[in-house]
C-alpha cells in the first residue's frame, strides 16, 4: 500500500540584477512538488527554470533573511506538529470532575493522616523501669490506613458541598467519619 504524499524541493536561483538592491543579496526560491515515486534531478530544474524566466514579471525576490526566517518557522511548526505528547498535568486535567475539585484533597476525597504522615504506623513510647523503648503500632487516628476522609468535602471531592449536611443520612455519615468507620474512596 503506497502512501500518496509529495515532497517539496526548494532551489535558490540567482535573482535578476534589476530587482535586487546593490547592498542586499537576494535569492529567488523555486519550489517544486513531486510525488514520492518520482525522482527529482537537475534536468527537471533546468526545464522549470526556463518557465520561470518566462514568468519573471510575476515573481518577487526574497531576501536571505526572510528566506531563513521562513525556513526556521516552518521547520519549527513541522516539528511541533509531528510530536504530540500528553503531559501529566493535562492528563490529570482530563480526569477532573467538571465542577472543579476540593482545595484540601485536590478532588481525591482523602487526605493523608496528620498523626502518622500517611504511613499507618505510629511511634509509641513504651516505658518499662529504667529504659524507654519506641514501638511502632497501628495509628489510632486512621487505624493503619494512612488516609482520612477529607473533612472539607466529606469525601466527595467537590469544592462546594452545600446542603450535604442537610441530607437525612448526614448525621450517620459524620459519625462514621469521626469514628474511622468511613473509608476513603468508598
Swiss-Prot record:
Tissue expression pattern: Expressed in leaves and flowers. Expressed at low levels in siliques.
UniProt CXXCXGXG motif repeat ranges: 102-109, 113-120, 139-146, 150-157
Residues at which Zn(2+) 1 binds: 102, 105, 150, 153
Compositionally biased region (Low complexity): 8-22, 39-49
Compartment annotation: Plastid, Chloroplast thylakoid lumen
Main localization (coarse): plastid
Biological role: Involved in female gametophyte development. Required for embryo sac development. Nuclear genome-encoded factor required for the accumulation of photosystem I (PSI) during plant development. Required for light acclimation and chloroplast development.
Protein name listed in UniProt: Protein PHOTOSYSTEM I ASSEMBLY 2, chloroplastic
Gene encoding the protein: PSA2
Amino acid at each position: 500500500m503506497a502512501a500518496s504524499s509529495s515532497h517539496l524541493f526548494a532551489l535558490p536561483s540567482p535573482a535578476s540584477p534589476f530587482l535586487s538592491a546593490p547592498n542586499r543579496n537576494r535569492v529567488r526560491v523555486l519550489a517544486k512538488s513531486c510525488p514520492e515515486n518520482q525522482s527529482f534531478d537537475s534536468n527537471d530544474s533546468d526545464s522549470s527554470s526556463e518557465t520561470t524566466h518566462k514568468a519573471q514579471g510575476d515573481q518577487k525576490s526574497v531576501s536571505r533573511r526572510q528566506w531563513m526566517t521562513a525556513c526556521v518557522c516552518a521547520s519549527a511548526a513541522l516539528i511541533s506538529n509531528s510530536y504530540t505528547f500528553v503531559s501529566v498535568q493535562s492528563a490529570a486535567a482530563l480526569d477532573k470532575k467538571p465542577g472543579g475539585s476540593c482545595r484540601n484533597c485536590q478532588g481525591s476525597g482523602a487526605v493523608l493522616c496528620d498523626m502518622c504522615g500517611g504511613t499507618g504506623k505510629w511511634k509509641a513510647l513504651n516505658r518499662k523501669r529504667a529504659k524507654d523503648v519506641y514501638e511502632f503500632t497501628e495509628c489510632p487516628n486512621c487505624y493503619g490506613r494512612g488516609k482520612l476522609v477529607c473533612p472539607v468535602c466529606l469525601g466527595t471531592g467537590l469544592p462546594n458541598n452545600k446542603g450535604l449536611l442537610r441530607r437525612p443520612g448526614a448525621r450517620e455519615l459524620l459519625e462514621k467519619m469521626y469514628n474511622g468507620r468511613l473509608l476513603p474512596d468508598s
